[in-house]
Amino acid sequence: MHAPHTATALRRTKKLPPLRVGIGGPVGSGKTTLLEMLCKGMRERYDLVAITNDIYTKEDQRLLTIAGALPEERIMGVETGGCPHTAIREDASINLEAVERMLARFPDADIVFIESGGDNLAATFSPELSDLTIYVIDVAGGEKIPRKGGPGITKSDLLVINKTDLAPLVGANLDVMASDTKKMRGERPYVMCNLKALDGVADVIAFIEKKGLLTV
């Protein structure tokens, strides 16, 4: 398994708490894949831990462990037992407790990734839980998805439009999706991605480093 090289990390000053990055989006959009790719792309420079949310299982925790995203002890699965939106917004106590437990184990952590359970376009993270929010949608959901709006589309710090390779198969026009995204988000950034091929992952990492004040 891979251990983070904390001695040479480009990291926040330890006077600041670790950066908390929330990853949300509908079921099947690619949240877990994004989290896997971020962990693999950042673990050599930063001390990372990850928390996943599922309603009745710890499936995403299992998938990340099998994929070798991080050592098993650095990934915690949370069973919300109900609406995934509630667990990251209205009553985020179960996730706040998970963050506290992980930081007790790994007090030098630079970044805590928190993946929500699959939810609708209205899902948002509590500011108590997340410093940066990344919302993932996918092209297979239809060209119209950006136009539907909702806080995930319009208010997230970064919007990831995944599975661009499927556009020809589902009749989606990526130029239209990009145009609609700009109309809905204004100056807020977005990234077109094919996460399975690592296309766009570097842009997401650069965003986290810049907005999270991780670069020196």
From Swiss-Prot:
Residues annotated as binding GTP: 25-32
Main location per the UniProt record: cytoplasm
Keyword set includes Hydrolase: no
GO molecular function: GTP binding; GTPase activity; nickel cation binding
Keywords (A to Z) from UniProt: Chaperone, Cytoplasm, GTP-binding, Nickel insertion, Nucleotide-binding
Domain of life from the UniProt record: Bacteria
Localization (cell): Cytoplasm
GO cellular component, one term: cytoplasm
GO terms for biological process, alphabetical: urea catabolic process
Stored SUPFAM superfamilies: P-loop containing nucleoside triphosphate hydrolases
Record family assignment: Belongs to the SIMIBI class G3E GTPase family. UreG subfamily.
Function summary: Facilitates the functional incorporation of the urease nickel metallocenter. This process requires GTP hydrolysis, probably effectuated by UreG.
Subunit architecture: Homodimer. UreD, UreF and UreG form a complex that acts as a GTP-hydrolysis-dependent molecular chaperone, activating the urease apoprotein by helping to assemble the nickel containing metallocenter of UreC. The UreE protein probably delivers the nickel.
Name of the protein: Urease accessory protein UreG
Source organism of this protein record: Burkholderia thailandensis (strain ATCC 700388 / DSM 13276 / CCUG 48851 / CIP 106301 / E264)
Gene it is expressed from: ureG
